């Protein structure tokens, strides 16, 4: 059985697991990990097939969640960014006793646009899948550029994301394709109506991948959850607004 790359730091009385997004790895959290580890016992994870978690092929969302959970603390706040938000949500649905609170960051329960639902057009996701086989490094870079577009620090933030990708070996094409397939097909809108733990959803007002118009729709669908929008952030608010991001998480800790 292959192991997930996992790093634990800090000695807070609350565990916080951080799950990164598509194409990236746990190095993306380095902009906030020192500060967070003074408040939490922090767990940095490379999702299966990404970063240092080698030897995994394409996986379903359920299998990815189970693989991550095998090395996790008994109970933690689970925070997932983008694709990682789906993994954290899946864990909250299947193992609620392990989840002290669920936090999703720039994530959607259904990334793909559907009838009366805003998201990424399916042909855009299919296009990324096609381009991966032609020039996957350039495709990943294009996807990263989309994530920071519109912010005051867009170039700087895009460079930070690119540096994270290039710091470690690139994921295999089938792993990247598998991640895109999850983004294209998964829809957790109805299942997440049933979670009972504290549920905080964080968004960037300028996010081009998760439109802000879904926020009030989910406020209505999930009245038990809370939402918070970073006014000048795009898809990676923890990179563009690290201090504000940390304050939001520390405030959550006081409540759970």
UniProtKB/Swiss-Prot annotation:
UniProt: substrate binding residues: 22, 82-83, 143-147, 235
Catalytic site positions: 82 (nucleophile), 207, 235
SUPFAM superfamilies: alpha/beta-Hydrolases
InterPro entries: AB_hydrolase_1, AB_hydrolase_fold, BioH, Carboxylesterase_BioH
Membrane-spanning segments: none
Tree of life domain: Bacteria
Domain (AB hydrolase-1) ranges: 15-242
GO biological process, one term: biotin biosynthetic process
Reactions catalysed according to its record: 6-carboxyhexanoyl-[ACP] methyl ester + H2O = 6-carboxyhexanoyl-[ACP] + methanol + H(+)
GO terms of molecular function: pimelyl-[acyl-carrier protein] methyl ester esterase activity
A single Gene Ontology CC term: cytoplasm
Compartments it resides in: Cytoplasm
Top-level enzyme category: hydrolase
Pathway info: Cofactor biosynthesis; biotin biosynthesis
Keyword annotations from UniProtKB, A to Z: Biotin biosynthesis, Cytoplasm, Hydrolase, Serine esterase
Enzyme Commission number(s) of this protein: 3.1.1.85
Similarity comment: Belongs to the AB hydrolase superfamily. Carboxylesterase BioH family.
Function: The physiological role of BioH is to remove the methyl group introduced by BioC when the pimeloyl moiety is complete. It allows to synthesize pimeloyl-ACP via the fatty acid synthetic pathway through the hydrolysis of the ester bonds of pimeloyl-ACP esters.
Name of the protein described by the UniProt record: Pimeloyl-[acyl-carrier protein] methyl ester esterase
Provenance organism: Shigella dysenteriae serotype 1 (strain Sd197)
Originating gene: bioH
């Amino acid at each position: 059985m292959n192991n997930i790359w996992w790093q634990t730091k800090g000695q807070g009385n609350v565990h916080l697991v951080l799950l990164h997004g598509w194409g990236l790895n746990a190095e993306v959290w380095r902009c906030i990990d020192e500060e967070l580890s003074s408040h939490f016992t922090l767990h940095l994870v490379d999702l299966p097939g990404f970063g240092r978690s080698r030897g995994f092929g394409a996986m379903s969302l359920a299998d990815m969640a189970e693989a991550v959970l095998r090395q996790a603390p008994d109970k933690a706040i689970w925070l997932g960014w983008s694709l990682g938000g789906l993994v954290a949500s899946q864990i909250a649905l299947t193992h609620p006793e392990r989840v002290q609170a669920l936090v999703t960051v720039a994530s959607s329960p259904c990334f793909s646009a559907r009838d009366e639902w805003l998201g990424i057009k399916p042909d855009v996701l299919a296009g990324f899948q096609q381009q991966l086989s032609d020039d996957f490094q350039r495709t990943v870079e294009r996807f990263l550029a989309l994530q920071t577009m519109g912010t005051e620090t867009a170039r700087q933030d895009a460079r930070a994301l690119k540096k994270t990708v290039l710091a470690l070996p690139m994921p295999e094409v089938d792993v990247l394709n598998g991640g895109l397939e999850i983004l294209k097909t998964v829809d957790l809108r109805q299942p997440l109506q049933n979670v009972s733990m504290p549920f905080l959803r964080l968004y960037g007002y300028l996010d081009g991948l998760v439109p802000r118009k879904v926020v009030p729709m989910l406020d209505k669908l999930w009245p038990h959850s809370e939402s918070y929008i970073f006014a000048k952030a795009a898809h990676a608010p923890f990179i563009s607004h690290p201090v504000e991001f940390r304050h939001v998480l520390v405030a959550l800790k006081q409540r759970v």
